């Protein structure tokens, strides 16, 4: 059985850094549109369901988006999903957001891409009262190090 850790922080606690994306990469932010269910590289039933959740207002707020990091050759190197509160985690309040899932192509790991994107999300919400959540598998040391470095606290298991 997989064990998960739950982390959380608010803008008065999390740490925003001045980070620079490596020169060979650029970020695009995807938002749901009627005829765009997911970025083409991420088309799957999971992303289709989230697209439906957005349009059917299952998500408790309209902030669903996906941060995409591309190489100069237009290949997807990394993605981070920002999910609004919904029934899966009933403890989340209406304005809360979950960072994740997060995925980095193996060839692009250790470039600071996840760190950069998560920092961008923190910066985007630094003057708000939103609570951000992060869920990771207990054995995922890199993921735990990433979010603990942003001053998120482990809330539960």
Feature locations, PLM:
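Acyl-donor-binding surface of acyltransferase catalytic domains
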Residues: 1-52
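Conserved catalytic-core motifs of GNAT/GCN5-like acyltransferases
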Residues: 4-7, 153-157
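A conserved beta-strand-loop-helix scaffold within acyl/acetyltransferase catalytic domains
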Residues: 45-102
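Conserved acetyl-CoA-binding loop-helix of GNAT-fold acetyltransferases
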Residues: 101-104, 110-124, 145, 149
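Residue-level recognition of the GNAT/N-acetyltransferase active site
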Residues: 105, 137
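Conserved GNAT acetyl-CoA-binding A-motif
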Residues: 125-136
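Conserved active-site alpha-helix within GNAT-family acetyltransferase domains
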Residues: 138-156
